[in-house]
Design a protein with these regions (language model features):
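Bacterial Sec-dependent N-terminal signal peptides
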Residues: 1-24
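Phosphate-group recognition and catalysis centered on beta-loop-alpha active-site segments
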Residues: 22-148
Length: 148
């Protein structure tokens, strides 16, 4: 094989590798929560996403007034604003499937067990910039500390 042929083969292999990486992936938004026994952003929805063999599961996080990060899409639980409540005030809140509101710590620990599932974390915005900035720092530190 001459240098010209080697160059063509190498270029084709590189293009093939790039096309594999650029393929569309399926993400379970808030986990696979329409399944029986599941609820949005629940640990069950995370496990069900893995069982469905999707590429990843997106989930939303909010931080309480005392700095505990919880997994929840809305900025309220019932009529309680998560960012104004302490974790103690909301920790027993039930999701539609009966699970209690998961913390980010619990969610990441569960996600770590699901080796083929990518976790896509969305930090929900907060009207209070200082609270939002602290949430970002807390979340990034937790993810790094867990080696994820």
């Amino acid at each position: 094989m001459n240098i010209y042929q080697k160059t063509i083969v190498t270029a084709c292999l590189c293009l093939a590798a790039l096309s594999i990486q650029a393929q569309t992936q399926v993400i379970a938004h808030r986990g696979y929560w329409k399944a029986e026994g599941s609820a949005q952003n629940s640990l069950a929805s995370l496990r069900k996403a893995a069982e469905a063999k999707v590429y990843g599961a997106e989930f939303d996080v909010q931080m309480t007034a005392d700095g505990i990060v919880v997994v929840n899409h809305d900025n309220t639980i019932g009529s309680t604003a998560i960012s104004r409540a302490t974790y103690e005030q909301i920790k027993d809140s039930k999701l539609k499937n009966g699970e209690t509101l998961p913390t980010l710590q619990a969610y990441l620990e569960e996600g770590r067990k699901l080796k083929d599932l990518q976790l896509i974390l969305e930090i929900k915005k907060n009207k209070n910039k200082e609270h939002e900035d602290q949430a970002v720092k807390t979340i990034v530190k937790m993810v790094k500390d867990m080696g994820m």
